[in-house]
Structures are given as C-alpha cells and as structure tokens.
C-alpha cells in the first residue's frame, strides 16, 4: 500500500508463481506463472506521476516535443499519467520545468494544505502551482 500511495515501483520475488514487477501506478508490468519462473524488465527510476487536473495537454505536448525519447503512460481511470524519459539526456525535472506541471504528490499536498485550512475555518491560500492559468479539464495548444 505504501508503494502505491507514494508511487514507487515494486519488484517482488516469491517462491510461489506470482512474482511481479509493478509500476508506480499499481499496474502489473510482468509476472511469473507456472511456465515462466523468471521475469525481468528495465526500470527507469527518473519518472514522475502527475495528475490530469490542469495537465490534460501535457502528455501530448511532451510526446510531440520528444518523439521516441520520452514514454508517457495514461491511467485515465485514476486521473494520472506516468512520464519516463527514455533518452538519458532528458530528465523529468527538465520536463516539469519546460511544460509547467507538478507531480501528483505535490498536487495532493497542495490540496491537503487547503483542506486543513478549511477545516480550521480559514480560507484556503491562493493556489500557486506550476500550471499557472491553464484550464482544469481541457487541452490547450
């Protein structure tokens, strides 16, 4: 549960037939079974999980700017997307600065702080996020 909440990769090795490699969004990428008892997969530890709010156009913009150099996986049921550079010369920090998006962890923390103030009877502070004035639920050019 901790790994899912904090968006970590999980690589398990068990004696039964269900060893797994799980991505930061909880999806099984590889799994052993009765016939396949060894699995492997490259894992890029420079990745970012982001929330779609205010970022609907970001995956398309990244893929257009860096074709074949950055992998973006979409998990719309969870309102998340995963960004992983394939090219070693590109970092997620660079992509976040260039396209103005924050990690899901930053997004959720901003909301926790706002909710805390509301519960204390105070107005939430103005949101200062990487997205600026982008629309919450729409793609932009």
Regions found by a protein language model. Give the residues of each.
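A short C-terminal boundary segment appended to hydrolase-like catalytic domains
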Residues: 46-141
């Amino acid at each position: 549960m901790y790994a899912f909440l904090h968006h970590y990769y999980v690589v398990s090795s068990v004696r039964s037939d269900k060893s797994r490699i799980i991505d930061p969004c909880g999806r099984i990428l590889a799994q052993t079974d009765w016939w396949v008892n060894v699995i492997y997969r490259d894992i890029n530890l420079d990745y970012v999980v982001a929330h779609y709010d205010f970022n609907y156009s970001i995956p398309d913009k990244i893929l257009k700017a860096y074709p074949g150099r950055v992998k973006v996986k979409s998990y719309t049921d969870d309102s998340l997307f995963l960004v992983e550079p394939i090219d070693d010369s590109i970092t997620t920090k660079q992509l976040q600065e260039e396209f103005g998006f924050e990690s899901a962890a930053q997004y959720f923390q901003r909301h926790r702080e706002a909710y805390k103030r509301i519960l204390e009877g105070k107005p939430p502070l103005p949101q200062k996020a990487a997205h600026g004035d982008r629309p919450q639920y729409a793609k932009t050019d």
